[in-house]
Amino acid sequence: MQLAVLTLALCWAYPVTIYISYLLSRLGIALYRKHKDSTTGAWYEKHRKAAFTAIFWLQLVQCFDLAISITITGYAMNISPQVEAWWVDKEFLASNIAVFMFLAAGLLPDPDVPFSPSLSHSHAWIAGIIMEALQLAMFCNQQSPVSVLSRVEYLQLGLVMVRLVLFVAMVALYFQPMYAWSRIQLDETEPLLGEVDSKPVRDAQHGGWLDYVVGFSTLFPFLWPSDSRRLQLRAIFCFVLLVIQRVVNILVPHQLGIVVAHLGSGTIPYQKIAIYIALRALQGQQGVIGSIRALLWIPVSQSTYRRLTSSAFEHVLSLSLEFHLGKRIGEVMSALSKGSALNTFLDGLVFQLFPMVADLWIAALYFLIQFDAFYSLIVITVTWLYLFVTIYMAKYRGRARREMVNREREMEAAKTDALMSYETVHHNSAVPHEINRFNRLVQAFQKAEYFVFFSLNLLNATQNLLFTAGVAIVCLLCAYQISADMQQVAMFVTLLTYLAQLQAPLNFFGSFYTQVQNNLVDAERMLALFKEKPLVQDRDGAIDLNTCAGRVEFTHVNFAYDERRPALQDVSFTVEPGTSTAIVGESGSGKSTILKLLFRFYDVAAGSVRFDGVDARDMTIASLRSHLGVVPQDTILFNDTLLYNLLYARPQATMEEVYAACRAASIHDRIMSFPDGYETKVGERGLRLSGGEKQRIAIARTFLRSPQILLLDEATASLDSQTERQIQGALDNIAKGRTTITIAHRLSTITKANQIIVLHQGRIVEKGTHEELLAANGMYSQMWAKQTKAKEKKDSNATLVEVA
């Protein structure tokens, strides 16, 4: 009796141990890989590939071995029932089938990588060694007499021994290249192996679902409503309702069987029918319990979406300027819109996938207890095949879906670029080119889309065929048992009802897995955004710059956007509080780079930038920027009213302050001439305003901000001469008592600057006042002479036109 219990336990423990070993190993490796990648070389890759080829053939032999063992067991159970041995049992048969499925699944081709068993597979093989050794001990413990029938038993014994040896060989082959490589790394003192190409190697099959889960763990804190106790209680109660739904799913077919069993008694079983109807009312997503759960979950789902999308938006705004300059706005916008994909994924995972898996395991256990192991085996086999085919085909569909999403992004990005560059497109008569370009991208998208839909229909047909085959086998088996008086008709009804219930979650899994893949592919870009780290951020212990006198110091500053091409080299200068400094030079000399460093869009590579003697890197970015006001060369306005754009600098400003700032910028009268005045819509990026109007709005906005340090990036470059003179006077007024740093193209606007810095190829070549630099007869003097000559020629031409 004790031996029989051990035998039964071994049969169930064998496949469970292998699968759990594999899954736990995958999870551990995924968590480890999140923090570290291993590095190997070309020698290791060559020998690893050879070892994997040998493992493939060994695993194939393993599958043949198990197939023979399954055949012998089935033969002994059905053709020669007089065979009495512990392995002639349904549990042993089920165990071998489960192990066969695991090994056979590993042999199927992967769409992304060639056959490459992972470290997790080796852990499962080690578990197989232990379990096969226990089976061998079971065989050796039998005391069957030698007879004709015992030859079959000894054949089974030989098959177990072969499997044990094969498992050991597979493990040895897997670890041998690793061991040899580690010895080479320890003993190597010179490059005897030739050139070694180091690269990160992942020993798990690429893109596994556990890797996805671990990768998305960055977003897990946004999924649980940790900021609301009320929402947490709602979520917990929803989980309780899920458990109740699982119980109801068992009771419905069981109660139907009871009703059918009592129908032949000559009386109507009203009570049992009422119980069945009540259970049916509670069952399913549209039942009473499911509806209550869905209503309770709505605020939890909304809270998750709000936290996720708001955090993503905040994170993108916190990223450094380099990220925004290097990304296409259409792609970033598309990624930010994928918060709903993760929200949908969470809802499906918690309330659809987990309940479905629970229902399938409960069904297998129910069939085992209520019927026998054959029914449980059939359910497990059909379920496994259904899920495996779904996941396996979804690997190909995932790649196709990713290709389709990439084509869609390119299509959307091209459309966004063309619309945002409307004037440029028409200036260059490029409308036909943009239309043809967009049409080509649409065709590429539809080609990828066709394969996605084709593979979906193929998957659905395969799933239906598998489930129909399983139902047919169960019906035939149950019908045979009923005809042999081994089961009652009521059990047939219960069986078919339960199978019908299982079809819904299985069919759902097909669509859900596809939906999950779509959601994860869609959300990959959002995850990538969260993984982006700002190059410039507050260091630990950074201080707040509460007050600022306005002293600015550049000390031996070096900086480069690309290390191969320095933008600034050994730049040093000081701007005293309340003084003005102008920076001039040819295009690409580094003028705008200095403003970017002042605003801390970038940090210096060497040297320091100091404000009132404090290194900019030692103060918080927000407090530093609160003392800076910028009038950029290219003003970008929000697609809102003029008033909104003006108040953006200081939302609490009064209308009188807004009017004063606009008068100082010579734009108030122009605004009042508009039909809607300050409520005039400026259009996308301010396209409804002229360049000069946008520039004056930017100047007025800076006046309203009233910073201690003014940064003017060719602030009057877009203005005509008359307006420039008006603005220049206003700029002189607001600059009194404030530090002003001006990037100038027109040298006539900076003649009164306390200090002029001349840049050439990232270096300071001259420094001084206007008069000093003219007297030096250097680069500044040449630039002045060139611009003066051009202005005189322009004025002369204008005079001739007036005379004519």
Swiss-Prot record:
GO molecular function terms attached to this record: ABC-type transporter activity; ATP binding; ATP hydrolysis activity
Keyword Hydrolase: no
Superkingdom, taxonomy of origin: Eukaryota
Topological relation to the membrane, as annotated: Multi-pass membrane protein
InterPro entries for the chain: AAA+_ATPase, ABC1_TM_dom, ABC1_TM_sf, ABC_transporter-like_ATP-bd, ABC_transporter-like_CS, P-loop_NTPase, Type_1_exporter
Its job: ABC transporter; part of the gene cluster that mediates the biosynthesis of aspirochlorine (or antibiotic A30641), an unusual halogenated spiro compound with distinctive antifungal properties due to selective inhibition of protein biosynthesis, and which is also active against bacteria, viruses, and murine tumor cells.
Classification via CDD domains: ABC_6TM_HMT1, ABCC_ATM1_transporter
Residues annotated as binding ATP: G585, E586, S587, G588, S589, G590, K591, S592
Gene3D superfamilies, A to Z: ABC transporter type 1, transmembrane domain, P-loop containing nucleotide triphosphate hydrolases
ABC transporter domain mapped to chain residues: 552-786
Entry-listed glycosylation sites: N460, N639, N797
Origin organism lineage: Eukaryota, Fungi, Dikarya, Ascomycota, Pezizomycotina
A matching Pfam family: ABC_tran
Residue intervals passing through the bilayer: 3-23, 52-72, 97-117, 119-139, 155-175, 206-226, 239-259, 349-369, 373-393, 464-484, 489-509
Subcellular localization(s) per the UniProt record: Membrane
Primary localisation category: membrane
GO cellular component: vacuolar membrane
Listed name of the protein: ABC transporter aclQ
Keyword terms of this UniProt record: ATP-binding, Glycoprotein, Membrane, Nucleotide-binding, Transmembrane, Transmembrane helix, Transport
Domain spans labelled ABC transmembrane type-1: 236-518
Family the UniProt entry places it in: Belongs to the ABC transporter superfamily. ABCB family. Heavy Metal importer (TC 3.A.1.210) subfamily.
